[in-house]
Amino acid sequence: MKFFGRLNNIHSRELIKYIWTAGLAFAAIALMFFGYYYKDRYVRVDDKSPLDISIDQLEIAVRENPENPEARVALAEFYLGKGLYSQAIEQTDQVLSTFPENTGALLISGITYTRSGQSQKAIAPLEKFIDLRKDDPMALSDTALQTAYYFLGESYNTLGQADKALPALEAALKINSTDADALFQAGLSSQTMNDHEKAIEFFDRAVLFVPDFTEAYAGMIESYTALNKPDHSDYARGMQAFSLKDYKTAQRYLESAREALPDFASAHFGLALTYEQLNRLDDALISVKIALQLDPNNFSLQQVQERIETAIKAQG
């Protein structure tokens, strides 16, 4: 998985941002608890706690009070989480026809259109949501706003409009610079605009946070090839194989990259990880130490060295 502990059975990595069940607080149907899973973290708008409400309860709430926008938004979010896209859109449309600036309905509508492959229809609600939230004093810590920027960027990428996608994705990264999905999509935007150096920078940052990000390595291969850097392409192919648990293939490519690029810390690091999986711990330790000499401030390298040293000691 891209993010450790992340949910399974979701689309390819670049399409992953999962929205899950929200709730409706029932003290005679009072407050909506709008929440969503954002990668492997649970984010709650306004820091309200969600309740575990069944779909039957949510549907009953809407039938009993069809004019309540919060009830419809909660139901729409539940439908979105279940992949029932047409039902989700039906609910958000009902809300937006009366309350065109309901931010919950706008965000769910935009995400639902993106997830259902209707990227063009996603643009308007996402842009309106962003316009309503971007000038808030807390905008730079607004995770819902960050998510809207991400989906707007993904939608523009899908539509082949990289020049519009990249600013949205960069705005998402200002709020959360560790969002590997946004970094990957920004890399795709840069590729489309033939800025392969910048694309590689984005892909590199993505795999820093998610070492097994297969699609990011595929992006690296494409950009390194475009830049006529075959040895760096070997590194990316090796790490792609590593992410797919094909460690022998990874070893072959990474050893080739190491020989051609002895000062490239990432090749040594990739080899350390590969040797570790092949239980060649002494070789892994040598490789990670070389990587640390080349990149002494890399905390990830320090952690891997400690892990390998601990494993060697455990073997006696």
Give the residues covered by each predicted segment.
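N-terminal leader/linker segments that initiate helical-solenoid repeat arrays
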Residues: K2-A74, G81-L84, E90-Q91, S97
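Flexible helix-coil transition and linker loops at the boundaries of alpha-helical arrays
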Residues: A61-E64, D131-L145
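Structural marker of alpha-solenoid helical repeat scaffolds
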Residues: E64, T98-F99, L132, I175, ...
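Helix-start (N-cap) detector for alpha-helical repeat units in TPR-like alpha-solenoids
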Residues: P69-E70, T103-G104, P137, L145-Q146, ...
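Register position in tetratricopeptide repeats
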Residues: G81, R115, F151, T158, ...
